[in-house]
Amino acid sequence: MTKVISLSLGLTVGILLFSQIAFELSYEKCYPEAGNLGIVRAYYHNLETGESMGDDGDIYDYSVFAPIAAALAENMPIEVEKATCINSYTANGNYYYENQLLSDDEQCLMVDTCFFQTFGIPVLKGNPNDLINSNTLFVSESFARRFFGDADPIGKVLILERKTEMIVRGVYRDIPENTMFKADFVVSVHKEGGYKDGAGWGGNDIFYAVFRTGEASDIEVVNDNIQRMVEKYMPTEHNGWKLELSVIPLATKHQTSSETTKRLVIYGFLGFSIFFVAIMNYMLIVIATLGRRAKSVGVHKCNGANNGNIFSMFMMETGIIVLVSILVCAFIIFNARDLIEDLLSVRLASLFTWGTLWVPLLVVVLLFLLAGVLPGRIFSHIPVTQVFRRYTDGKKGWKRSLLFIQFTGVSFVLGLLLVTLMQYSHLMNRDMGINTAGLVEAESWLDIEIVPHMRDEIRRQPMVESVATASHSVLGQYWTKGLMGSDGKRIGVLNMNYVDFNYPDVVGITIIEGKPMTHAKDLLVNEEIVRLKKWTDGAVGKPFDEIKEGTIVGVFRDVRNQSFYQAQQPIVLIGGNAFNHTFNVRLKEPYDENLKRLNEFMDKTFPQVALTFHTVDDMLSEIYKDVYRFRNSVLITSGFILLIVIMGLIGYVNDETQRRSKEIAIRKVNGAEASNILRLLVCDILYVSIPSILLGIVIAYFIGKAWLEQFAEQVDLNPLLFLATALIVAIIIVACVVLKAWHIANENPVNSIKSE
């Protein structure tokens, strides 16, 4: 039973983590002739300082100007067969079907007419050219089944923001999950001969440009010519910054991201740790039975069995145990599928496809070979003479080596757990510069005329303390432009949020210098702007060149609007009272009950308006959900590996006390106390555990440091905390040894000696 539990746990986690790695390595390879797909990327760098800006954790920005895709197809018709313009940034509005708001899980993209042909996605119903109409919508097969059942989806209507009808004109085959362009439905990106939110060349760079070539080698030709092509349409230098365009195969984007590489390396370490700890534990348990099973091996050899027969017998035994473990593993995965899918952010049906099924099969084969070959070889080489005498070879070297690997693995995983627990706690409890308790928010583009009335009606409600509107959510990137220094050179990216005068009070922003806004174009700047501008004499009263006719009336404490994934941004709040996108409401207690009452009031009073309020705390949790999932993955892995190691350690101690029972009895006859016996066994374990624990903790420290590099704000990794973790692991090991050996240490030595 112990062997089955050990292998089942190791097999479960190993299969899931290694399959996740294979899944991510298959990103963007789900399309026909995926090697012919390319994506445009931008490289912004300062010609004087060499400073660069990127959105992939490195130096490249994959969001570019809307016309680039069409220009590629027009200027390079020989190489580029099709090119498509995609917007995922502003695609996800509030969509309703039969007056029910679609879940946030329903993903949407804004695409042009060439989207399906470029990617090779089959269109099952409808004409993709209908996407030229701005109110057109295509849905996936699964979306059509979920919402329309057996009815024909063509002509069905979804309502955007409860005011714009979006008509279903077609159905396409589901897009697999291993792509950045997964969409349950797509809407047209076209508008009045241009692109929604585009603003042409040099305008809004929020679009992906993906193209298909005739041959994979043509991507390099496009790369050689794209810069010259763009320079035909717009200047690529401005204020000392240079824009350079290049292209890469789409399939390499995800794999070459530094964040992806780090994540997969960590998954690999975790999977390797628990998988091999489980195998080592199985070997340890099997080898521990050597003394008891030697005689039966000798009997088999006396009856004509050779080494090969004995080896086959033990491989057969391992095969049966592995088969049972596979069944237990399948049972665990099937019954915990919801938890697993949440932790890995992928459906099991996508994780285990025909293309990736080789991963679990390879894991099972490796498990069988590694767990069976070594024990089988050891048992097959037991001399036939052992049938006549007791086999006393304890294989101590093997056992200690196996224990060393197990202790290293468990200390590594627990050390990594320490890092994830501390960082997640740091992210969720760190001061964001706003007061999130009781703060709720809703976003929707509304007619400016109705906003004052809605604001007043919300303010009058008994559950509401205060309300303010703004152009942007308090969390996320605002409208941006270059922040210039006194020498006219760019010193940062300015985030601009247009807000009501009482906005700072509502969201809990602290003004540390000056006064609140009271007039249009009054400006509040954050501490980061003061630092970058080097205003040592104060900022109040100064004009702000980036905002025409604006005057700074105060300085507020820094707000981490882009979370702690990003460095602190320079922010300016621009005062006014005519903003129609984001409603910020400060609720009275009890918050959860009053949030429910507020949303009920909105549905009843303003049924034509798509405003659903959510807590800012929930928005933060959503931002950090990947950290939360990773933390839980490490937590579960830690629990599994600790259980496996404890089972193996108990088996080892049990075997050692039985094998050395006569030695222990003789020591007691010669005056040794129980404490002396326990000290003997504990020291024997510590000889192995101390160096292995320290090795595992050191590995965890460096892997944890690599994982933390994705955050601009990192928890301090105090070495003393890692030493404390090592001490806890050592205490657990010693406790297991003492508890298991307590009986034999206190047993009457006569009971052990009389059997001789």
Question: Which role does the model predict for each range below?
Answer:
Residues V111-K125, L137-E259, D456, R460-I623:
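Mid-to-C-terminal secondary-structure elements
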Residues M1, Y31-P32, Q227-S273, G291-R292, ...:
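Membrane-helix entry/capping segments
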Residues L17-G93, G198, G202-R212, A216-N225, ...:
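Membrane-proximal extracellular/periplasmic loop immediately following the first transmembrane helix
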